[in-house]
Amino acid sequence: MSDSVSISVPYRNLRKEIELETVTKHRQNESGSSSFSESASPSNHSDSADGESVSKNCSLVTLVLSCTVAAGVQFGWALQLSLLTPYIQTLGISHAFSSFIWLCGPITGLVVQPFVGIWSDKCTSKYGRRRPFILVGSFMISIAVIIIGFSADIGYLLGDSKEHCSTFKGTRTRAAVVFIIGFWLLDLANNTVQGPARALLADLSGPDQRNTANAVFCLWMAIGNILGFSAGASGKWQEWFPFLTSRACCAACGNLKAAFLLAVVFLTICTLVTIYFAKEIPFTSNKPTRIQDSAPLLDDLQSKGLEHSKLNNGTANGIKYERVERDTDEQFGNSENEHQDETYVDGPGSVLVNLLTSLRHLPPAMHSVLIVMALTWLSWFPFFLFDTDWMGREVYHGDPTGDSLHMELYDQGVREGALGLLLNSVVLGISSFLIEPMCQRMGARVVWALSNFTVFACMAGTAVISLMSLSDDKNGIEYIMRGNETTRTAAVIVFALLGFPLAITYSVPFSVTAEVTADSGGGQGLAIGVLNLAIVIPQMIVSLGAGPWDQLFGGGNLPAFVLASVAAFAAGVIALQRLPTLSSSFKSTGFHIG
């Protein structure tokens, strides 16, 4: 296009020809300016002729060491996923309301990530744009997990019951409030770290290193998951560190406290390694932000870029653009105002509004993607919330607020559930290598549908296992103590098998979105943001409704799991009927919900 201009929009690539023209023009006008020569140098982090953040690849060792923080964050997330729903019930919060605490995840993900993304893009710290946020976020995670681990002791000091925790079965209100504060702070901190950590890797990796960088990042996440679930499954920490138990903090609490203190040590080491080896070049505020500075390592979604002639004020792809007119000869006359005419209202509020209003401008096929994605997460989130609780209650017949015998059975089930989640992570990691050939052979539409049908079968399997386990009650407590190895083994197998569809859920929908929106230019990045809405809104629905829904049918986790099975089946059917047939090409993507 002969008179196209580059404009400032969030997450965008500047047109190659425009940047080349800019460099040529500026060199002609100010060839003696050392400052420009420095900024136009191919080695500069922010400016390069090809529009990449880094024009020269960094070493593989640097890439590997620069994203170790992913393992530290994931370690804590694994403990959060496996231990915290059971633990909040030991503080007296009923099962019906235990799901409410998980509201913080989708809310902070929806609100915090746009703020952190924009602030890190504009950060002019001498330590770089991403590392300050990673450091602060990691510190917040450490504070949060310490608050959670010591919530019972803090509540005791603030006036909770002085009765020993082994005999007191009531609600410890102050401890529960402290726990919830720590839980929300933990989710906020997780979202503070994860976005800048991925953006840092995008900053450091060269154009031909994106797939490698993404694989390394996902590998560290898998390592963190495996270590975290292993820590949660041990159940022996309070025996190795008996001084962590107290009058307010019994065995389960001491185990949680020790595991989280280990998480603090591990996260600190990982963060320091990342901070040391990730060499960022400080950002100069008078330079426009590039797409790669903020792009997640999903795909080169903005490869087509935005092309606009001189625009009147208007809307395209759900984003409001202002008229951009300038004379090329005058553009470089005043370097101080070089980019003042490139304007975009990029506040966090504007980002959220754009995400909502852009629903009208998405390709028709994208609406089907959003429906399938929403149903997919309606099927997954009940499992994320209640997996180990289900193992402790339905499979092991335990009760977190019962007598010592039932509490021991419950704790044993929770540890077994954490072991199942460990196997789930292993299967997920192995399955991630199979997704690409499967998509090339069957197509992404069929693969996504297959994953949902697998979830349907597994969640239906939890119902069968629950009914089989409940039939053991008539055999008496001694039989329950010995346990039915068939049902317990089957439950662990279900946990492990769910790693296969989870790997697909973490990758294929984003590649489908990339292909469906491939012809919409800059709308692709916005479509990924809209896809996130199809994740967080179902999470909010499940967080608010799962506990009361279970209570409506007498308690337990079976009602929510049955509903999840129905949602998974519906997602599979709609995926086969409504999703478009896509090309067989597939680029693996990485994703995490936290």
UniProtKB/Swiss-Prot annotation:
Compositionally biased intervals (Low complexity): 31-46
Tissues and organs where the protein is expressed, per its UniProt entry: Mostly localized in parenchymatic cells next to vascular tissues (at protein level). Present in stipules, trichomes, hydathodes and guard cells of source leaves, as well as in lateral root tips and flowers.
Protein name: Sucrose transport protein SUC3
Membrane topology, as annotated: Multi-pass membrane protein
Catalytic activity: sucrose(out) + H(+)(out) = sucrose(in) + H(+)(in)
Pathway note: Glycan biosynthesis; sucrose metabolism
One annotated Gene Ontology cellular component of this protein: plasma membrane
PANTHER family per UniProt: SOLUTE CARRIER FAMILY 45 MEMBER 3 ISOFORM X1, SUGAR TRANSPORTER
Positions of transmembrane segments: 59-79, 99-119, 132-152, 175-195, 215-235, 258-278, 366-386, 418-438, 446-466, 490-510, 526-546, 556-576
PTM annotation (N-acetylserine): residues: 2
Organism: Arabidopsis thaliana
Subunit structure, interactors included: Homodimer. Interacts with SUC2 and SUC4.
Gene Ontology molecular function: sucrose transmembrane transporter activity; symporter activity
Cytoplasmic topological domain residue ranges: 2-58, 120-131, 196-214, 279-365, 439-445, 511-525, 577-594
